[in-house]
Amino acid sequence: MLRVLLVTDTDKPIGDLRDALARLGYDMLAETATPEALHRIVQSERPDVIIIDTESPSRDTLEQLAVMNAAAPRPVLMFSADANQQLIRDAVGAGVTAYLVEGLATERLAPILEVALARFAQESQLRERLAQAENELAE
């Protein structure tokens, strides 16, 4: 069972989201992190997947994601109202696996999570192959 950490910087209630994820069979971590606490909570709780609900990801959030992704990469889904192309590129560069605009709809969660998990697994394999090739070249 995958462990999911929810991160939000909005005032929207997230009970429906938590319920939908639980119905899909995900283990919901007890704490809903704020972007500022992301790195600390990821280190202590070790979620398998992170879902971020934000109006617009802040520079601090993206920096925390980049640090987390460098230390212990994991799939990150970001739901945002901000469709700014540069912001989307920055989010992907920080480690966001899937960036979705137009808000978080619980009925779309299952396919979105499946795509994000598959893409993350593929990227992880590529990173491993790259590291192996670099090691072989160094020898």
PLM features: residue spans?
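CheY-like receiver
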Residues: R119-E139
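C-terminal output helix
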Residues: Q86-L87, L104-L113
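Conserved acidic segment of CheY-like receiver
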Residues: M1-P13, L17-L21, I50
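Conserved phosphotransfer microenvironments
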Residues: I14, T34-H39, D48-M68, A83-N84
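Short hydrophobic/Thr-rich beta-strand motif most characteristic of the beta2 strand and flanking loop
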Residues: G25-T34, I41
